């Protein structure tokens, strides 16, 4: 049974244009309050981004739903997430596909996310501590890649790791950022601009 707060959020997301009911079902199934600090639990089902420490945030539910919807996932999709963060977006993906690969540059966040996912019995996720700019070459190619922080330009390594017909969704820019969708068609990459957004920057390298 979906709580009143969750139902209200889902209706808000529908009003904002989210149409994929499977994505909405995944949002309803994942307890967002488990991925944030106790001090913010009362705001868990509000449509806002929240801090998770280390200068990072958990994205607002609308943006999670929008980016996930743009990936056009099927259960068989091979998915790479860049920026595990709290693990919330990872959990949404894990409800929609058979397996998710996720890369996080901050070791502490990776550990916390793995613990949360395990507590929720989400075992179809592989996480890695590493530089998100480089993707996860050993697991490539991917049908879908989602990036939860903004590089100033689209990383070429991520485009190279897309399979034929694959989709990359990411925010791009410095002061001014736009959500982009990149689709691979043979040797070409078709890039569409979706909407203006605001994300933390995608930093190169990794932190212990």
From Swiss-Prot:
Primary gene name: pcm
GO cellular component: cytoplasm
Job description of the protein: Catalyzes the methyl esterification of L-isoaspartyl residues in peptides and proteins that result from spontaneous decomposition of normal L-aspartyl and L-asparaginyl residues. It plays a role in the repair and/or degradation of damaged proteins.
Keyword Chloroplast: no
InterPro entries attached to this UniProt entry: PCMT (IPR000682), SAM-dependent_MTases_sf (IPR029063)
Protein name per UniProt: Protein-L-isoaspartate O-methyltransferase
Species classification: Bacteria, Pseudomonadati, Pseudomonadota, Gammaproteobacteria, Enterobacterales
UniProtKB keywords: Cytoplasm, Methyltransferase, S-adenosyl-L-methionine, Transferase
This enzyme's EC code(s): 2.1.1.77
